[in-house]
């Protein structure tokens, strides 16, 4: 099992104002590191007869978030969708399943360092179930995807956002 859980927000900036070096740095951490993890584990998984790769993306990898000018974060998380789906079809016959997880607002260090308490309350109110997620919410989904119980699941996008992207 490989869980790629790399991610930084980086500089929040509209496209025209973002420094190219910062864009590349964010993509290197959020996207290229995931590619490298997969590249280096797939041969071992093939020799073992299969495995599960779980790429942690974001709802920002599914939909643009209005009011949050963060082109590099969005681009890097959208890229994980294509990487996941392509690897799923390339290695399915080898018994390797590849899926992505797209969390919404989850109470992590990234959230608490980038949002004020007031902003977290606003985020909670914007979620249909009226709370932000906890890390355990995501870990339960990851455990399922890592297990044999998800043996017929590959190339899938799993949204865990309390219904936020449904509105």
What are these model-derived regions, one by one?
Residues 9-12, 142-143, 154-167:
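Short C-terminal tail/terminal secondary-structure segment
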Residues 38, 76, 84:
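Active-site helix of classical SDR
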């Amino acid at each position: 099992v490989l869980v790629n859980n790399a991610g930084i927000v980086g500089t929040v900036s509209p496209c025209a104002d973002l420094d190219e070096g910062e864009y590349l740095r964010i993509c290197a951490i959020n996207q290229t590191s995931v590619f490298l993890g997969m590249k280096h584990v797939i041969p071992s998984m093939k020799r073992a007869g299969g495995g599960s790769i779980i790429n942690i993306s974001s709802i920002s990898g599914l939909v643009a978030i209005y009011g949050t000018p963060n082109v590099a974060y969005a681009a890097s998380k959208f890229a994980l969708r294509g990487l996941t789906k392509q690897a799923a079809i390339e290695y399915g016959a080898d018994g390797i399943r590849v899926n992505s997880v797209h969390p919404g607002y989850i109470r992590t260090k990234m959230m608490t360092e980038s949002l004020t308490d007031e902003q977290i309350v606003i985020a909670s109110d914007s979620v249909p179930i009226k709370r932000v997620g906890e890390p355990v919410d995501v870990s339960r989904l990851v455990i399922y995807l890592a297990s044999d119980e998800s043996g017929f699941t590959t190339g899938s996008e799993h949204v865990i956002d309390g219904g936020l992207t449904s509105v």
